[in-house]
Amino acid sequence: MGAGKMGSFFIDLLSFEHEVAVFERDAKRMRFTYNCQRFTTYEEIELFKPELLINAVTLKYTIPVFKEVIPYLPKECIISDIASVKTDMKEFYESTGMRYVSTHPMFGPTFANLQQLSEENAIIISEGDYMGRIFFKDLYQKLGLNIYEYTFEEHDKTVAYSLSIPFVSTFVFAAVMKHQDAPGTTFKRHMRIAKGVLNEDDYLLQEILFNPYTHDQVAQIRTELKELLEIIDNKDAAGMKGYLTKIRNNVKRDIEIK
């Protein structure tokens, strides 16, 4: 469902080993899809009788599209999503009576090199259909992804940390930045990140930040900024040295500091 960036990625990934069809209301978006059937009506899906349906539409429409298409699916069909935010998904899935599997490829096409994913991660929700989980585990392993299994709740806690902190940091950078005719390397790198984040769907950004676990993460940023501003205002050299030592120690498991 959906022929956007991730929908097209899954079509390319699956179409040479499986019989694949793509549904997209806007037929023009399917112009560059290959080796698959192209549908624009739910009746075509009904005749196709899919064994697995991957919902790759914009986050805002994930559940509404499920509600529309489920009446046209075989009872044994596994329904699945790849949404970045899983709020309300567990309750929805359990209300349908359908087999389901939920995953989150954490390498959106905005930043990742889709030809080289060995440094990227994917989450498979541990709740749901066993065979569906096995299918996606095999698929993601073939891509060389690092795979983690979380419950719906654990997933949303992870997303609150791994997405909200960099997103909010980018928002702050974009809010205060001024155009630079001759930007330095660090500035240009931040600009590239800002370009990627700010080109994301507004609803996706909103839902990530409205995640119930996000507030405490953002509050931590505010606390750190307050401490750093006090050090700057006081020109506290010892305090700055201590602060730099603290943050280097905080990231030493993930970043090599020379």
List each model region and its residues.
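Rossmann-fold dinucleotide-binding core
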Residues: 85, 89, 93-147
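Redox-cofactor binding/interface segments in oxidoreductases and associated redox assembly factors
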Residues: 54-55, 80, 124
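Short acidic-hydrophobic, aromatic-tinged amphipathic segments that line or gate anion-handling sites
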Residues: 37-43, 148-152
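ADP-ribose/adenylate-binding Rossmann-like module
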Residues: 72-92
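Rossmann-like NAD(P)-binding element
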Residues: 43-72
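An accessory alpha-helical subdomain
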Residues: 149-258
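Short loop/helix-cap segments at secondary-structure boundaries that form the rim of catalytic
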Residues: 27-35, 47, 90-96
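NAD(P)+-binding Rossmann beta1-loop-alpha1 motif at the extreme N-terminus of oxidoreductases
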Residues: 1-39
